[in-house]
Amino acid sequence: MIPPADSLLKHDNPVLISKNTERKSPKSRPLKVSSPQTVLTAPVPPPPKPKTPLLDATKPAEEILNAILPPREWVENNQLWIQQVSSTPSTRMDVVHLQEELDMKLQQRQARETGICPVRRELYSQCFDELIRQVTINCAERGLLLLRVRDEIHMTISAYQTLYESSVAFGMRKALQAEQGKSDMEKRMADLEMEKKDLERQVNEQKAKCEAIEKREAERRQVEEKKHAEEIQFLKRTNQQLKAQLEGIIAPKK
C-alpha cells in the first residue's frame, strides 16, 4: 500500500474500505452526475463568497475534525483506502517536531524565502491545518475560529490571485497593443524616410536646374551688356563724326 503524498497534517493509519471498487454492491447508491449546463451568452457571475460550515462545537472532536479537515481517499489496485485526520492530542514535542519538519521541507523543496512561492504557501497551509487540528482537539471553539481565519486567508489570497491574473492579462494586452503600435510607427517612419529621400532628390534636381538657369542668364546678360556697350560706343563715334561734319559746314559761313 502506497499512501498519498506526505503532508505536515498528521493522519491516522490508512484503512481499507473496499477490496474491489469495480464490484458494485446492490445497496450502493449510484453516483449523481450533473447534466451539462446549457452554454449561456450572458456573463457568468462570480462565485459566491465561501463560508465556513456551521458546526456544533459540542459534537465529538473526531466528527468536527472530519468536517473541517476531510479524510484522504485514494484507489490502489482496485482497493479504496481512506485516511482520517488524527485525533490524538499533541504535546510540546509534537509542536517542536512540526517546526523542525516544516523547516526541513522548506529546505528540501527549495522554497523561496521571499516573494510569491507556491511551495512555501503549500507547506505553511499544511502547517496551519496541523495547528488547527491540534487546537481543535483541545478546544473546539478555538479550532473553529481558526478555521474561519484560514478560510478568510484563502479567500483573500484567491482574490489577490484573480486580481494578479487579470492585471497580467491586461498588461499583456497593452504590451501587444504597444507592439502593434510600434510596428505601425516603424512602417510610418520608413515611409516618411523614403518620402524624405525622394523630396531631397527633387530639391537637388531643382537646385541644379536653378544653377544652370542662373549661369545661362548670367552669360546672356554679359553678352547683352557687351552688345549694348558696343552699340553705345558706335553711337558715340557716329555722333562725334556728325558733330564734326556739322561744325565743318557751319564754320565757313561765319
Swiss-Prot record:
GO terms for cellular component: axoneme; ciliary base; dynein axonemal particle; dynein complex; motile cilium; sperm flagellum. Pfam families: Ax_dynein_light. Residues 1-55 are annotated as: Disordered. Signal peptide: none annotated. InterPro entries: Axonemal_dynein_light_chain. It is found in: Cell projection, Cilium; Cell projection, Cilium, Flagellum; Dynein axonemal particle; Cytoplasm. One of its GO terms (molecular function) is dynein heavy chain binding. GO terms for biological process: sperm flagellum assembly. Residues 175-245 form a coiled coil. Keywords: Cell projection, Cilium, Coiled coil, Cytoplasm, Dynein, Flagellum, Motor protein. Belongs to the inner dynein arm light chain family. PANTHER family: AXONEMAL DYNEIN LIGHT INTERMEDIATE POLYPEPTIDE 1, AXONEMAL INNER ARM DYNEIN LIGHT CHAIN 28. Involved in sperm flagellum assembly. This is Axonemal dynein light intermediate polypeptide 1.
